[in-house]
Design a protein with these regions (language model features):
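C-terminal extensions of enzymes
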Residues: 1-8, 251-294
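An N-cap/entry alpha-helix motif that binds or orients negatively charged groups
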Residues: 1-41, 284, 290-294
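Generic secondary-structure signature for well-ordered alpha-helical cores
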Residues: 13-20, 73, 117-121, 158-161, ...
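Short, charged beta->alpha transition segments
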Residues: 27-38, 76-88, 111
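Active-site cofactor/substrate anionic-group-binding motifs, chiefly glycine-
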Residues: 36-80
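Short glycine-enriched loops at secondary-structure junctions
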Residues: 51-53, 78-84, 128-129, 172
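Alpha/beta enzyme core
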Residues: 66, 91, 103-220, 227-251, ...
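A gly/proline- and charged-residue-enriched helix-loop-helix capping module
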Residues: 69-105
């Protein structure tokens, strides 16, 4: 057997190992609507917190946000200048700003303050950018990073003034610490395979939910390419999912193309919900999923 060490391939293989049963009797037309952080959206498929999309297409960050706004989904954004974030928000996209774990916490507080003043509905941090692959602290575009303590995360939570979310959680261990810090949500993610042999987010999701319950939103990131992928995450307990790299090639075609693909993913999700007897997101049931063992 030729086993890959690539987390992206491992994640894809895990998605493809999950099979669904159907439930037609007494089923009805489903609704994919969801409320997150006090705002209503058309579906639980969100855009992922990407950065530097101008390298993919001119004005890529704004195009990405405009696509999210047109599709009526929650938008996430990563690194970028204050001016870029303001342009993203000018599209009307309801946006979550994710901030790197800068070594100097004053940088973190400053970026949070600007994001909230500019109109972001939530902020957060991708904690997995703390270390490099050689065991030292990471550096992102020359900016020094550092691992954060639970107390530091609590300080960010208390200072934010809006919901604070931790991205890069891949264990019950970190999830429980996020709860202790008062986080308003977590993103289960291996950050596009930052570490070889990382467990697929969807694989560890049930263990995380067993540890922390459903008191806060638990989002799933990495490898989401279809409404079927989204359904599998939701059935196993995710609140919503993020699609990122799957949408990147569409940036050259414009916001309408991005919105159209997100809309298609929502329709794919609704199609699977209908065929498995799920009328609303609150009725998701993990017992519909079977693991391939052949």
């Amino acid at each position: 057997m030729n086993l890959s060490s690539s987390p992206d391939q491992i994640t894809r293989d895990f998605f493809d190992s999950l099979l669904l049963e159907t439930r037609y009797l007494d089923s009805s037309i489903p609704s994919t609507e969801i409320t997150l952080f006090g705002h209503s959206f058309s579906m639980p498929v969100m855009t992922a917190a990407l950065s530097h999309l101008d390298n993919t297409a001119p004005g890529g960050m704004v195009t990405y946000a405009a696509g999210a706004a047109k599709a009526d989904v929650l938008h996430w954004v990563g690194m970028g200048s204050e001016q870029e974030l303001e342009a993203v928000l000018a599209t009307g996209a309801k946006t979550v700003k994710i901030i790197k774990p800068h070594a100097d916490n004053r940088v973190v507080f400053g970026k949070m303050e600007h994001a909230v003043k500019a109109g972001c509905i939530a902020v957060g941090m991708d904690i997995d950018h703390a270390f490099n692959s050689q065991g030292g602290y990471d550096s992102v575009f020359g900016l020094p990073m550092k691992a954060k303590t639970t107390d530091e995360i609590r300080d960010f939570v208390q200072a934010a003034g809006v919901p604070f979310i931790v991205k890069g959680v891949l264990s019950p261990y970190d999830a429980e610490k996020c709860i202790k810090a008062g986080c308003a949500g977590i993103v289960v993610s291996h950050h596009h395979g930052m570490m070889q042999y990382s467990v697929p987010p969807l694989m560890v999701l049930p263990d995380i939910l067993k540890a922390i319950g459903h008191d806060i939103p638990v989002f799933v990131d990495c490898g989401i390419e279809s409404g079927m992928d989204a359904y599998k995450c939701l059935a196993l307990g995710a609140t919503a999912v993020s699609a990122g790299r799957h949408l990147m090639p569409l940036l050259k075609e414009g916001a309408d193309a991005v919105a159209a693909r997100i809309g298609q993913m929502g329709a794919e999700l609704a199609g699977v919900m209908a065929r498995t007897g799920v009328a609303s997101l609150s009725q998701m049931d993990s017992s519909v999923i079977h693991k391939r063992n052949f």
